[in-house]
Amino acid sequence: MTGSVIVGVDGSETAYKAASRAATLAEGLDAELVVVSAHITGNTEVVHIGNDTWILDDAEQALKLAEQVAVKLREQHPSVKVRPAAGRGKPQDVLIEEAERVGAQLLVVGNVGMKGLRRVLGSVAWSVVHNAPCDVLVVKTAS
């Protein structure tokens, strides 16, 4: 199989577990791994600390998070091509849009606890399973 495996990350340990599983799958499938982080707003904030001025940007922070995870995954899976990506919107929408954009063959998400039917999957996983343009793997990352 060639193509792309998409995985979403949000900085949590459970998301990293899903990303690690996705890297293992991408390695076995000889596929590119795209590590995706979402940001809801396009906020930019200027912060002054002493004589320093910092510009904090949501999009930049989301991409930085994806890059940090990509670096760790490259160390653990040196044969896998890992590419970070970020997008603006709800996580499930960003993941689905990226999967459509690259023609992904697999989208990997972790499960999280929610109420009702979504408790089994979590709201992001539930939405991705029902709307993704490709196969979806839900990794059991939380009970």
Mark where each language-model region is.
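Glycine-rich, Arg-bearing micro-motifs that act as flexible, cationic patches
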Residues: L106-S127
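A short acidic, glycine-rich active-site loop
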Residues: D52-L65
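General small-molecule cofactor/ligand-binding pocket signal
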Residues: V36, R83-G87, L137
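Short, well-ordered secondary-structure micro-motifs
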Residues: A18, E45-H48, V94-E97, R119-V120
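Short secondary-structure boundary segments
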Residues: S37-A38, G110-V112, K140-T141
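Small/aliphatic-rich secondary-structure junction motif
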Residues: T2-D52
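Structural beta-alpha unit
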Residues: M1, T14, K72-L107, S143
